[in-house]
């Protein structure tokens, strides 16, 4: 698939832009702070409904504006769809497909599949479990868009149950008055059922994803660092001893009864952790507490991998995701944000080899020399200037290209 055209309005430093793209490689060149990363961020947002840089939408709305707009026309196997999302300060976002409003923004998920590799990805190896959970869930919803609804339902139940745990703890500390404690505990059992039902679906999806991803990860790491220890991944579940260890083995093939089994195990672990959860007032069981274990040889990558090995593992995770989506039947758009300058010659060559096979690659770089020579690319310059309306970015064709740039009044 490829993005044929995309548009921005009041998205970070871009006040208004419409840009036509073609398959192949396109490079956005500009100094740091001039807005080139914002271009990839906008397309990444259309793909995942999240930013690789910030955890909330507000920073993506240009200062002084009430909303931001990002839209793209995507061509996939000859079929063309246009999607757009409006980020509205203090309100729910709105989305459209071919100019028809959707009931929920998440309905656009899956139309634009992308994989982005950025300097922030080092946190996949060195950061908290939440970074790796997010990696899994974004890849999962890209493959299976309906999983976004499962995740949203799980998060909603988790918030409700967490609030109830705090209430239960307070009620039990006061002692039972008029059956208050019994009522709270009965209500908690109901929410246990909801959490187990949605959590089992999400957990089953993640486990299947790790099974499918593992061989691509091993191969990607081997191609990037052939002299290093072999790389592997394994899912670490908070269900603990309630879950058969076989279920987290990446070699295990998922079965049709997995969700039912996981829901049963979920209930068992919740019952065992009930007192501890009430005492602490937090939910200690579920996919929100899980992790993706990254292993080099027999050692965890976090804390044991060198800087170079950490970069190789982070890059391998992204390339494995790219290979998996491609194996599913469609080339995702590959986006590389200022990463070639961070890599040594071998890793640059390995990344360039994969990029050369992608249907569309979008790259940001500070100078042309940061981009490997083997990637023949159309190039655009990105410049920003300070105005009375704040810092505004503009894009200017450089070199030989027949692509069209439109600046709206």
Swiss-Prot record:
Query: Could you give one GO CC term from the UniProt record?
Result: cytoplasm
Which positions are annotated as binding ATP? 30-37
Q: Which UniProt keywords apply?
A: ATP-binding, Cytoplasm, DNA damage, DNA repair, DNA replication, DNA-binding, Nucleotide-binding, SOS response
Q: Which is an annotated GO molecular function term of this record?
A: ATP binding
Which Pfam family would be a valid example here?
SMC_N
SUPFAM superfamilies (alphabetical): P-loop containing nucleoside triphosphate hydrolases
Listed GO biological process terms: DNA replication; DNA synthesis involved in DNA repair; double-strand break repair; SOS response
NCBIfam families linked to this entry: recf
Q: What does this protein do?
A: The RecF protein is involved in DNA metabolism; it is required for DNA replication and normal SOS inducibility. RecF binds preferentially to single-stranded, linear DNA. It also seems to bind ATP.
What family does this belong to?
Answer: Belongs to the RecF family.
The name this protein goes by in its record: DNA replication and repair protein RecF
Per the UniProt record, the source organism is: Rhodococcus erythropolis (strain PR4 / NBRC 100887)
Starting at the broadest rank, the lineage of the source organism is:
Bacteria, Bacillati, Actinomycetota, Actinomycetes, Mycobacteriales
**Gene transcribed to yield this protein:** recF
